[in-house]
């Protein structure tokens, strides 16, 4: 192995481990980078922010935590949030323990003799729930009670929250979230691979130590290929989807030469690598079923947003540190308008559904076909319609897809064969997932009988394989072919409109999750003693001006550090 590759891998592994220090990869100036503004600087934000309970108190992670802190100051609200947490726990409880969990909820929160009776609950509804619980504890037993509890919290309690120091603190976090993002927000590490318009490399947020993958789209290459619409479409779809099973977009920014998408870093490699380069081709059935179930959940989340993926194949399914999968590369994904169909002969040969090959109209059926192809390949160790490393013309592959039934070996159990054959139905109207029930039809297949999808969706099931934390599951640095220089293309001022639409900075939910996961929220979210208002949250006070530097300090010290400055001597090199 070349010295350059050894050094690049060593530096990346050290960064993934948190740099070996107490700061876990954070810059030594991270508190300065994430310093709260005085609340008076958030006035415009306060006036413009939409007052939506679901968005501010449920969907946004920091908003949810701060609303819970507010509720903890009032006993009647504490009971409501404790009930909601109890319902969440009930929904992911294993089947055999769910009835006992439901009884505890009924006794604690819904009984007149219970210690934490929640307010404004119709007694008839409680009685119905108790009866249904004894008949059979279904996962959605408390759905209506949950809705009513949120409805109660969204009225007077929500209005009181908006006038509290907890909401003011939320405004400070939102102010930080909306600060400009530049290349200096990150440290850059080794190249991991290539995308359609440029390299993909590992990167790390200086302020938090969080690792990501940075997908660079070279501006000249985009312009030469007229790829502006495709690039913006991928960015906007990634921004819209919030799923445990689809890579998340955390930041979008621009440099002089490139547009950059900062995405979830998946250290475990892709399924193509694991199917074909980790011993005998293919997986044991249990492992293939686990991945198929997680992919099904990812497709369900995409389809819920009316997005058809259209490029499901092994190399686009990535593993994280723990062995869970995420769908990646949404360049061919497209939104399907409500009540309409779309048309487009796009995808990868061997994974395109018959209706796509025939250039017919469709909605979400191509994704369920591709899931069948992928499940088959994971079990058989080869694609259903083309053998690995065997050259076969595109026309012949497409003929097989349209006309010839796939063959099954004894590696397939009867249930695995049943699911594959139903997903690989040539007629989309008969295909599993396309009969009116969507993902629910697929989840209810007997092959998934032993899987608790609620627990799977919460990340509570142990994956069958965990990647080696000391391994780099990608090609050597020198084996990744470099892009040639784009010639004959000039960037013009009119291109800036497109760049501004693309480079929108931080994405709310992933950014807030980053603050929570890296413990920045926990360390910075401090209020005054005994509930007193800290100076930075006092509307009557004024921002404290930083002390003036002396002449010698201004001459010899570095510029004050904001979130976008380069870091000090503790930083690692940005390019190897």
Curated annotation (Swiss-Prot):
Protein name stated in the entry: G protein-coupled receptor kinase 6
The gene that this protein is the product of is Grk6
Q: Where does lipidation (S-palmitoyl cysteine) occur on this chain?
A: 561-562, 565
Q: Which GO terms describe its molecular function?
A: ATP binding; beta-adrenergic receptor kinase activity; G protein-coupled receptor kinase activity; protein kinase activity
Source organism phylogeny:
Eukaryota, Metazoa, Chordata, Craniata, Vertebrata
The residue ranges of the Protein kinase domain are 186-448
Tissues with expression:
Expressed in the brain in striatal neurons.
Which species expresses this protein natively?
Answer: Mus musculus
Instruction: Tell me the SMART domains matching this sequence.
Output: RGS, S_TK_X, S_TKc
Q: Report the top EC class in one word.
A: transferase
Q: Which InterPro entries match?
A: AGC-kinase_C, GPCR_kinase, Kinase-like_dom_sf, Prot_kinase_dom, Protein_kinase_ATP_BS, RGS, RGS_sf, RGS_subdomain_2
Q: What is its EC number?
A: 2.7.11.16
Q: Which Gene3D superfamilies does its entry note?
A: 6.10.250.2260, Phosphorylase Kinase, domain 1, Regulator of G-protein Signalling 4, domain 2, Transferase(Phosphotransferase) domain 1
Record's subcellular location: Membrane
């Amino acid at each position: 192995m070349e010295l350059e590759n050894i050094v690049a891998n060593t530096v990346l592994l050290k960064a993934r481990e948190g740099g070996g220090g107490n700061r876990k990869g954070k810059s030594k100036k991270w508190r300065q980078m994430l310093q709260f503004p005085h609340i008076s600087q958030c006035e415009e934000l306060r006036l413009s922010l939409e007052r939506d309970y679901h968005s501010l108190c449920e969907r946004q992670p920091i908003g949810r935590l701060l609303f819970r802190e507010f509720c903890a100051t009032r006993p009647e609200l504490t009971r409501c949030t404790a009930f909601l947490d109890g319902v969440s726990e009930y929904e992911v409880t294993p089947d055999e323990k769910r009835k006992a969990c439901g009884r505890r909820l009924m006794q604690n929160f819904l009984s007149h003799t219970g210690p934490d009776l929640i307010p404004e609950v119709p007694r008839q509804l409680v009685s119905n729930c108790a009866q249904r619980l004894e008949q059979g504890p279904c996962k959605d037993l408390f759905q209506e009670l949950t809705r009513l509890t949120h409805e109660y919290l969204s009225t007077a309690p929500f209005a009181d929250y908006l006038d509290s120091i907890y909401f003011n603190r939320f405004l400070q976090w939102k102010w930080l979230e909306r600060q400009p993002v530049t290349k200096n927000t990150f440290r850059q590490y080794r190249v991991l691979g290539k995308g359609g318009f440029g390299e993909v490399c590992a990167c790390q947020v200086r302020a938090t130590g969080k690792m990501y993958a940075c997908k660079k789209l070279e501006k000249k290459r985009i312009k030469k290929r007229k790829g502006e619409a495709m690039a913006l479409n991928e960015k906007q779809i990634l921004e819209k989807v919030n799923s445990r099973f689809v890579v998340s977009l955390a930041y979008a920014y621009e440099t002089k030469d490139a547009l950059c998408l900062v995405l979830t870093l998946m250290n475990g490699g892709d399924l193509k690598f694991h199917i074909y380069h980790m011993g005998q081709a293919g997986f044991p059935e249990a492992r293939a079923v686990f991945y198929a179930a997680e992919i099904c959940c990812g497709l369900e989340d995409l389809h819920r947003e009316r997005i058809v993926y259209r490029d499901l194949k092994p190399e686009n399914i990535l593993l994280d540190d723990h062995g869970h999968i995420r769908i990646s590369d949404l360049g061919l994904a497209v939104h399907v308008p409500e009540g309409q169909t779309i048309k487009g002969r796009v995808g990868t040969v061997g994974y395109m559904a018959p209706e796509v090959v025939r250039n017919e109209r469709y909605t979400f059926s191509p994704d369920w076909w591709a899931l069948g192809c992928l499940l088959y390949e994971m079990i058989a160790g080869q694609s259903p319609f083309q053998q690995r490393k065997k050259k076969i013309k595109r026309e012949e592959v497409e003929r097989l897809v349209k006309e010839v039934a796939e063959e099954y070996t004894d590696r397939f159990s009867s249930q695995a064969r049943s699911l594959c054959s139903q997903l690989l139905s040539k007629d989309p109207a008969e295909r599993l997932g396309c009969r009116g029930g969507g993902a629910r039809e697929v989840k209810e297949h007997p092959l998934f009988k032993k899987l608790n999808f609620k627990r799977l969706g919460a990340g509570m099931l142990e994956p069958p394989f965990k990647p080696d934390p000391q391994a780099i599951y990608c090609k050597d640095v020198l084996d990744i072919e470099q892009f040639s220089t784009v010639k004959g293309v000039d960037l013009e001022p009119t291109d800036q409109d497109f760049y501004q639409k693309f480079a929108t900075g931080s994405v709310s939910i992933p950014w807030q999750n980053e603050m929570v996961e890296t413990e920045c929220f926990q360390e910075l979210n401090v209020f005054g003693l005994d509930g007193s208002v800290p100076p930075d949250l006092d509307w009557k006070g004024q921002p404290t001006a930083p002390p003036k530097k002396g002449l010698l300090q201004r001459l010899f010290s570095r510029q004050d550090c904001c979130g976008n400055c380069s870091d000090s001597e503790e930083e690692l090199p940005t390019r190897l």
